[in-house]
Amino acid sequence: MAISYDLRPVGSCLERKTDNIVVKESSKLSLIGLSQDEIVQALKTVGVPERQTRMRARQLWHWLYVRGVSNFDEMLNISKVMQETLKHHFSIARPEIVGEQISKDGTRKWLLRFPARGAGRPVEIETVYIPEEGRGTLCLSSQVGCTLTCSFCHTGTQMLVRNLTAEEILAQLLVARDCLGDFPDKNTPDGAIVPVEGRKVTNIVMMGMGEPLYNYEAVKKALLIASDGDGLSLSKRRITLSTSGVVPGIIRTGEEIGVMLAISLHAVHDTVRDMLVPINKKYPLTLLMDACRNYPGLSNAKRITFEYVMLKDINDSLDDAKRLIQLLKGIPAKINLIPFNPWPGSNYQCSDWEQIERFADVVNQAGYASPIRTPRGRDILAACGQLKSASERLRKSERLKLENAIGH
């Protein structure tokens, strides 16, 4: 890993974004987030000869996801005439980067703004990059806000505004790779902490704002594009989808997406989990564990990660640790113990470090890997459970006023 703490603003993506990161022209269809078959159909509708559409779609796919271009003029093997046709009808622009924060530990957080859809306002979401020894993990958001109101999570205090589209989910990955110099012929910013060799973004986790399984189709589409071998080509073993326990979506995820699964568990008794993760009232632990045991492809080589935030005097007793072992019996699993990351207005305290270590020892002795996650990006509110944007849902009166103004 290239260790450098020279985090001067000169290295920020905000100062380098004017040429290739622009606000999408909302009147044009974006090619980002479309499947190759959908790109073929889109090309047919704008007069591209049918015999060329499949070849053109492959060219576009390469330029978008291998070369990482955000301007049709950069597509050197496409004629000027075709470039003009594409520019007239389609967009491949990036969202606006409203803000970028860099933690003292090298973690980066971007605040991205997406254009209004329908009668809504433009919305903002947060995306986080976490550099580690030999790898770089990108934490993606799936929704603007969240419906789940988990009591220890900052995002849960922001009501759901809307789901993100497949385009908007993928755009987070493209922006991060732009900013980190992770596409060919792109430079890594001065002072950035990134893996020395290979890709800067090696792993992605659907652990940002929102519940991915409440936006299943868009998340599925985005992850299948991200893992396509002719494009972004991320291994499905390096993609993790985290859910708070939307049981009906768990089996579908394994069958249709095939990525690694993480469960936001956080408690071993229904009474406690009802308080921490209210969706437990709908899908209690018995149903959740049954779904995990039946996750397609589950094996010692493809374990489920169970996330467990350590809350002082709430869920951190040694009896809780022993109950956790019983709960996971028969499930190939790893347990991530997460020291609670405070946020403005939170009502919980992090467990004492000695207690976290004792808890981990009990779980380890039962044969489960139970790493204690090192908090990353706490100083910029980028750590687990700290993400929140300022976007809010329009009140009904405001929405109607806007609809009338634009003639909908």
UniProtKB/Swiss-Prot annotation:
One GO cellular component, as annotated: cytoplasm
Q: What is its EC number?
A: 2.1.1.192
Its cofactor is: [4Fe-4S] cluster
Positions annotated to bind [4Fe-4S] cluster: C146, C150, C153
Q: Which GO terms describe its biological process?
A: rRNA base methylation; tRNA methylation
Quote the record's miscellaneous comment.
Reaction proceeds by a ping-pong mechanism involving intermediate methylation of a conserved cysteine residue.
Q: What is this protein called?
A: Dual-specificity RNA methyltransferase RlmN
Q: Please name the source species.
A: Bartonella tribocorum (strain CIP 105476 / IBS 506)
